[in-house]
Amino acid sequence: MWVRTVCFCFFSYLFAGEIGAAIPADFIFHDKPVDALCFFNMEGNEIDLNQCGLAKENYVMKGQNSKLIAEGFIGYNWQDPEFSDSAQGYSYYKFFNAGEKLYWLYTLNSGGGTGVFTAIHLVKRKKADILNLETLAGGDRCNGGLQNVSESNHHLIFSQNLTAYDLIALSKEPDPRVKAYDDLAACAICCVAKAYYKVDSNAQLKFDYVDLGTIADTKEMPNQGALQSCFNQLFISYIAAGNSKLTQNTLNEFAAKFKQTCTKLN
């Protein structure tokens, strides 16, 4: 009991003053910012703020990531005291005003393992102790993990990590014969590109483009899957030709070339 009480007071102290004054009332609960753990392992589209957070989980606070705090995130690192030798987890969020009492919420969570779970939600305060929440996008590292989140002209802009399988799946006519893992890399550490999106306050998600990056050698790419080697050669050829930014049309062309060149090898 003493440990939990001290940590809770420490938590309150860290979020008092300047940070509390900077966030909207919709993210204040019991005179403190909404607990970041409320946005981890959620079920349904409502959050009861009385039934979530550090105290409800019986976790202890283990400090903060100063870099994330400096970037405007709210949250902390935590640990389950029943497993004091285990790695620490963390929960952070950053809000963006979507207008009309709506907010885009970018969340970062880890349970202490290798997973890094990121998501974007559209959030509204329904009652004093209830948040409504709609998840717009999310994933774990290369399996749909989110980065580069910012607000511009009343839209939220972000990137989503893609595996080779995800990249082909984004095209208008992906080959249904191509299977994740068996044919193309789809693991959580198999990133090859980023897809960029825009979203408005009506939760309309719009694909913008894919950035293939600057990889110059197939040795730097994943090798999981029977068709991955052929995919890698096609991928590198696009970058070498200066075609690293793919709109929907050029992405469709890439997928068509992959189908023509690589799937016949299977």
Question: What is each PLM-predicted segment?
Answer:
Residues 57-141:
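Short N-terminal edge-element motif at the start of the domain
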Residues 5-14:
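Bacterial N-terminal signal peptides
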